[in-house]
Structures are given as C-alpha cells and as structure tokens.
Amino acid sequence: MDEFHRYGKEDNSRQQCFLYPLFFQEDLYAISHDHYLDGSSSSEPMEHLSSNDQFSFLTVKRLIGQIRQQNHSIVLFVNCAPNPLADCKKSSYSESVLEGLTLVLEVPFSIRSKYSGMNEWKSFRSIHSIFPFLEDKFPHSNYISDARIPYSIHPEILVRTFRRLIRDAPSLHPLRSVLYEYRNSPENLQRSIIVVPRVNTRFFLFLWNYYVYECESILFSLLKRSSHSRSLSHRPFPQRTHFHRKIKHIIIFSRRNSLKSIWLLKDPKIHYVRYGERSIIAIKGTHLLVKKCRYYLLLFRQCYFHLWSEPYRVCSHQLSKNCSSSPGYFLRVRMNPLFVRTKMLDELFIADLITNEFDPIVPIVPILGLLAREKFCDVSGRPISKLSWTNLTDDDILNRFDQIWRNLFHYYSGSFGRDGLYRIKYILSLSCAKTLACKHKSTIRVVRKELGPELFQKSFSKEREFDSLPFSSKAAARSQRERIWHSDIPQINPLVNSWQKIQDLKIENLFDQ
C-alpha cells in the first residue's frame, strides 16, 4: 500500500489524482487476492473456494476491460444469486475486483486526510462519550436535532461524492458500474438504492465510512467556531475589569421602556454525537442563530449531496429534551433547575448561576411495550413463554435472557429511580422459567426441581449488578444517589433490534405519505 501511496504523490494526486493505471497493476490484485483468501475482507465463510482454484490476472484484466466499456448488461458477479447483497457465493474474480477497487479508492482518501483540516477536529471516538454528552449538553441547548443518515444510499450520490476527490473520469467508471450492478436486484430495483453496510465487506464498509466522513465534514466549519465550554445562564455582571474576557463574548441589547438587558452570545455552540446511522446535534444560542444553523445544515447538505433526487433522504427532526433514543434504547429525561451561588475572596463579588441538571429516568412503560412486542409478556405485563426459543438448549435460553437483563440494567445504571427495573427483571425471569417449562413439557415447579433453584439465581443474581463497581459493599445504599454508566452497553439484543425497526418504519411511512 505504501508503494501505491507514493505513486499517487508522484503524480500530484492531491490536485489531479489519476488512479486508472493502478487498476492494471498485478501487485494490486495480488494484495486484494490475499485479502480475499485470508477472509479479512468479509466475515462470511469462504467454503465455496476450492483448493485448486487457480487465479489468473489475465481474467481480472479482461473484467476491467469489460467494466471500461460501460455495458451494464455484463454480469460481473457470475456466481451470485439474484440479490448480490444476500448470502450468496461470490467468485474470487469479482471479490478481487472489489478489493482492488477499494485499495485504489483508499489512496486519494488517505492522502486527503493528511492535508485536510478534519485532523484539527479533536473528537471522542468512543460510544462511551454519548452519556457525558447527554449530561453536559442536553440541559444547556436551545435546539436538539435527531438526524438519521440512512444506510440506503443512491449510487449516483456516491459517484458524485467521489468526483470531488478523484479527477480522472475513467477511475469513476468501475465504481459506477459496480454500484449499479449491485443496485439491479429485485429488492432494490423499485427504490433505486444501494444498501451499503448490510454486508460486512471491506468495499461497502469503505463506502459507508467515506459517506459519513463527507456528511460530518460540513459540520466542521461550524464546530471549529463554536466554543466547547459549558454554557450557563448568568445574571448581569457588574462593570469589573477581571470579567473583561468573558464580557468580550457578550453583546448587550437594550429594550425601550425596560431597565433590563438581554445578554446574547455571539456565536452559537454546536455539539455533535453519532452512533451508527443516528446522530444528535445540540445547538446553544439565540433563536435567530439557531434558526440559521438549522437552515444551513439542511439546505447545504441537500445541495452538497444532491439529495433532492434521493427518495430516502437524510431525515432530521427536533428532539424533545424529555426523551432520547440513543444508542438504540429509550431514555426519559427530567430537567431540574439548579441554583448555584459563587463567592469570591473577601466577599467582593457574589454571582448566582442558574443551570439545569440532567436527570435520566427509566421508561418502564415503553420497555414493557417492547417486551410485549417481542413476546416476553402480554400487553398487561404478564410474563409468557418465548415459544421461538424452545428449540434452543437450556444454556442458550438462560444466556439470552441473562444478556437482555444485563444490557438493560447496565444501560439504565446511570438513571434515577431504578426500582421499576426489578419489575422488568421479574418478567424476564418468569418468562425464562415458562420457556424452559414449555420446552420440557412440564411446569415451572418441575423445572426448578430438575434444574435446581440456584440456576435462576446465577443467571439473574442481584449481587452481580454491582460487581464492576469499586464500592460494591456500599453500592446498595448509594445506588439511588450516584450515577455510574457501565462501559459494556453496546450489546445487540432483540429489544434494540425491535426498537430500531419501529423507528425505521415510522421514518419510511413519513416519506411514503
């Protein structure tokens, strides 16, 4: 890869990036073929490859020549099912072409990242920064937007995005042909879209990451100007010299027939967080500045990505401060005003600070609705057996129920009023017992007698909830007064999948109307 990077630099790739000759270098496909054989480009099994599968670079070059002719009737993926994005068997040649195309496209992107100003954007690249973001930015923001970058992207949008990065048109022809070949499937033909990250290949992961990079780059100019300090609503300050720096960022507008002054910030404070395809933008500022930022983000994004031709565009709507759905679960929020009085030395100055305190609450009713939707209980909250899991082993059933409870408790560990979670625990434990009883065609009492009463205590033990806390001995007394966000929250379970399906269905219904 270093050799290809040097090749791009010698040709002044930052200004005129001619990458098409790289497609006909055998070293490129040697690297891509090794990636394909090692399974590093995909998480799918490679059982369809035979040991005597001879790879010919001449065949690959012929495929590149066919792509150059822009004949969309050519079947590039000869061994694929009607839907290439499904679990199908791809030939080694088509995989090598995709790997080679990915390696070529990564060259200008890596060179651009060295010169781009995005390197100055110091962000927290961890999912665990979401909860500090909610605690610090939610209470002090005037406008909170919940944006959704769809996984379904039109091929032409990706091609036009890469056109800003790659100067030579022949390099874009293979990309356009491959994208439209993937689009021409029975499921994607009506919508004319391409589902990017559903298949865990290096090619589609690169396309998705690059598309997200371009979406976030339009925020860089605003984020660079915005202040990252915590916003507090202050009372008017007296004229004192040691507040000169703070007063520089404040403008005084006096009203007629009023002795009060309105204190406004010059620049709005913009905070951004993303998890998967969903992102949250929090803006702090005046009503006019917030309105300008909203129009800037929406209109500039549409013009930048030509989103008027995309049926499933980037969806953005105002998010209430009383709820949040990131990352996947549902969280209710209660804002409590907090008054703080500060005093300087010798009692020369006293200032009253008014701020909001972020108090997350466990939403019991929505969680019960999700449990009822997934057939763990009925609509009234009465536990029922999970019939779809009766064909699993006893250990798998216990582990699945235990994982759901552990993820729920860890996610809401930083919330107040966690007593309602024990009702959820009771529903899950009894549903687990009924599932095992239904599997063995017996009763709950017989299952407990055969498997042992300690079996459910190990899976749903009360002590393990505080095993990771440094003060486990005093956790029971301090659990209601302290918030601790656990670090193993990004786990996949049926509740998160069900919640995401509900949200995606609501968004699709909005566009279909």
From Swiss-Prot:
Pfam families: Intron_maturas2 (PF01348), MatK_N (PF01824). Keywords: Chloroplast, mRNA processing, Plastid, RNA-binding, tRNA processing. GO terms for molecular function: RNA binding. Disulfide bonds: none annotated. GO terms for biological process: mRNA processing; RNA splicing; tRNA processing. It comes from the Eukaryota. GO terms for cellular component: chloroplast. It is found in: Plastid, Chloroplast. HAMAP family: MatK. Usually encoded in the trnK tRNA gene intron. Probably assists in splicing its own and other chloroplast group II introns. Belongs to the intron maturase 2 family. MatK subfamily. This is Maturase K. The lineage of its organism: Eukaryota, Viridiplantae, Streptophyta, Embryophyta, Tracheophyta.
